[in-house]
Regions:
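Cys-nucleophile CN-hydrolase/nitrilase-fold catalytic domain and related Cys-dependent amidase chemistry
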Residues: 2-89, 95, 161-181
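Active-site catalytic loop in hydrolytic enzyme cores
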Residues: 44-47, 57, 74-153, 163-176, ...
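CN hydrolase (nitrilase-like) catalytic-core segments centered on the catalytic cysteine
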Residues: 47-67, 129, 135-225
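Short beta-strand scaffold segments in enzyme catalytic cores
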Residues: 68-70, 82-85, 121, 187, ...
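Residue-level detector of high-confidence beta-strand sites
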Residues: 82, 95-97, 157, 217-219, ...
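Structured C-terminal cap/extension of enzyme domains
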Residues: 209-211, 221, 230-233, 239
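A conserved C-terminal secondary-structure "cap"
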Residues: 234-260
Length: 260
């Protein structure tokens, strides 16, 4: 699957893409459908592991910023669901570790991952300030806002999410987050049923602008697709001047939001 991802990056770059985000845990099946310690072997160091090093070369070759979600080993027995961010010159910029970890049928993630401990970093890249918010995290508005307060202009939501209530929410939560926080959101999903379980991943990757409008159409819900869209970064200033949500925040009244 690494070869497929590298080919997808090349395809996107050939169509003019300047930043590419891959799906959650991109280089293998979504193994969290089962609880099997054999999949601990999928971990690797970030950035010193072979996949990050390869992707640094790929990013430099194509001149694109890369967001690469992987299974990270910090030390033996300590694992995270992590996205590496690589600049267009091939320089590794840092990583986001998924903070919110689900544990329900078909998504046994607590068996594999510790909750992240790096907060909500935003990375200065060749295309602007980028944040990452992985899959299940999208249900938590606090992280979206933290990324906005840190200056994010584009937030990527790489996911592995399947049909059911989630499919309805897929068209609600990310546009709402884009509007409330006045940035672009790129949301990426797997497609189809994998041999490990019954999850039917519904694809439908898309970009949404800070007005809550889709940029072009969403991708197919049954076929893999490389989604390339043109984002007008000037729209960020237009929206923020019109809807001054950050000006009108009242953090002094939000104390209850951070109480356990």
């Amino acid at each position: 699957m690494i070869a497929n991802a590298v080919a997808a990056v090349a395809t996107a770059a050939s169509q003019g893409a300047q930043v590419v985000c891959l799906q959650e845990l991109f280089y293998g099946p979504y193994f969290c459908q089962v609880q099997d310690a054999d999949y601990y072997s999928y971990t690797e160091q970030i950035p010193d592991g072979p996949t990050t090093q390869l992707l640094c070369e790929v990013a430099k070759q194509h001149g694109v910023v890369l967001v690469a979600p992987m299974y990270e080993e910090e030390q033996p027995g300590v694992y995270y669901n992590t996205a590496a961010v690589i600049d267009a010159d091939g320089k590794y910029l840092g990583k986001h570790r998924k903070n919110h970890i689900p544990q329900v049928k078909g998504f046994w993630e607590k068996f594999y991952f510790r909750p992240g401990n790096l907060g909500y970093p935003v990375f200065d890249t060749a295309v602007g300030r980028i944040g990452v918010y992985i899959c299940y995290e999208r249900h938590f508005p606090e992280g979206w806002r933290a990324l906005g307060l840190a200056g994010a202009q584009i937030v990527f939501n790489p996911s592995a999410t399947s049909r059911g209530l989630s499919e309805y929410l897929w068209r609600l939560e990310q546009p709402a987050a884009a509007v409330a926080n006045e940035y672009y959101v790129g949301t990426i999903n797997r497609v189809g049923v994998e041999p490990l379980g019954e999850n039917d991943f519904y694809g439908q990757s898309y970009f949404v602008d800070p007005r809550g409008q889709l940029v072009g159409e969403a991708a197919s819900d049954t076929e893999e697709e490389v989604v390339v869209r043109d984002l007008d970064m000037g729209r960020l200033a237009e929206v923020r001047d019109l809807w001054a949500f950050y000006r009108d925040r009242r953090p002094d009244s939000y104390e209850s939001l951070v109480k356990p």
